[in-house]
């Protein structure tokens, strides 16, 4: 099985360059390919006809990594998110005309850029924290282009709300955001301490607004997520009720994949492809 699967994977044109192998170096979870990349690929394919109506189609990935991953337990490597997205866009007949990729580590950005160019993409790269590079990324989007912002930070600490606010200024932009439930659930009670600030950029002012006298600690993560969603809606976006729950294969929730847009068509398409065993969160609000 592994042999057959590896034969279908496009070889790495730069095997000597950095490869993402997860925080412990043993490989990323299989859910990265089976869930995160699969949903992105299905969305790009399902929206191909709508995308063709735009002369310029841009992917924005401010947490791009090196563009190549190794899944735990596999001997071979695979495309990272931005490279996989570009290949899917080509296969679907509506290739991205420009990819804007960024990472805090220059070597990882350079590796991603080279791998994308090897696949035939037009790329512009940015080095630095996403909350700093996103302004330049926004300016690099051609006027009137359709943009897809793929926001995939390692944890909630780096999901600065200012990233979303700045990208929201674009005329045509849809978002696919990985919201770290694991980080939120594990640490929100500690973050109530005003001396700590890990979540302050993700949802400014949350600590003062949190109804700690009314909610149990176990209810705080749901309140935080709901309040974050309302902040996104206040920017003029509709959040899809279908939010795939990404787990680690051991029953532990890692992310919610949150999609939001201003136009009803991409929202309807996302709902169709993401509808599964995942619960519609907004049914309970």
Language model features: what each stretch is:
Residues 2-57, 74:
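Class I SAM-dependent methyltransferase Rossmann-like catalytic core
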Residues 35-136:
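SAM cofactor-binding core of SAM-dependent methyltransferases
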Residues 53-54, 140-145:
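Glycine-rich phosphate-binding loop signature in dinucleotide/nucleotide-binding domains
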Residues 133-142, 165:
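Short amphipathic alpha-helix with an adjacent loop that forms part of the alpha/beta core around
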Residues 156-170:
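A short, conserved alpha-helix within the catalytic core of class I
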Residues 171-186:
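Conserved beta-strand signature within the Rossmann-like core of class I S-adenosyl-L-methionine
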Residues 188-249:
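A conserved mid-domain beta-alpha-beta active-site/ligand-binding segment of alpha/beta enzyme cores
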Residues 264-285:
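Flexible, glycine-/basic-rich loop-and-beta segments that form/coincide
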């Amino acid at each position: 099985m592994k042999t057959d699967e590896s034969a279908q994977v496009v070889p790495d044109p730069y095997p000597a360059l950095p490869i993402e192998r997860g925080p412990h170096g043993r490989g990323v979870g299989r859910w990265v390919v089976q869930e995160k990349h699969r949903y992105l690929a299905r969305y790009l394919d399902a929206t191909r006809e709508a995308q063709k109506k735009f002369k310029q189609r841009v992917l924005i990935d401010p947490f791009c990594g090196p563009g190549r991953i190794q899944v735990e337990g596999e001997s071979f490597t695979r495309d990272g998110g931005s490279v996989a997205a570009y290949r899917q866009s080509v296969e679907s007949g509506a290739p991205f005309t420009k990819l804007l990729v960024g990472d805090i580590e220059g070597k990882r950005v350079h590796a991603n850029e080279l791998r994308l160019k090897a696949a035939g993409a037009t790329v512009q790269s940015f080095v630095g924290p996403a909350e700093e590079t996103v302004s330049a990324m926004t300016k690099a989007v051609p006027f009137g282009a359709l943009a897809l912002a793929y926001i995939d930070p390692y944890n909630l600490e780096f999901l600065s709300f200012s990233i979303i606010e700045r990208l929201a200024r674009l005329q045509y932009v849809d978002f696919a955001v990985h919201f770290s439930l694991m980080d939120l659930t594990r640490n929100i009670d500690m973050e109530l301490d005003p001396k700590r600030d890990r979540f302050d950029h993700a949802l400014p002012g949350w600590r003062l607004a949190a109804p700690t006298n009314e909610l149990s600690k176990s209810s705080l993560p749901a309140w935080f997520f709901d309040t974050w969603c309302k902040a996104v809606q206040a920017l003029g976006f509709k959040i899809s009720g279908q939010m795939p729950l990404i787990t680690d294969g051991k029953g532990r929730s890692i992310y919610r994949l949150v999609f939001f847009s201003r136009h009803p068509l991409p929202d309807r398409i996302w709902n169709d492809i993401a509808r599964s065993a995942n619960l519609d969160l907004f049914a309970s609000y």
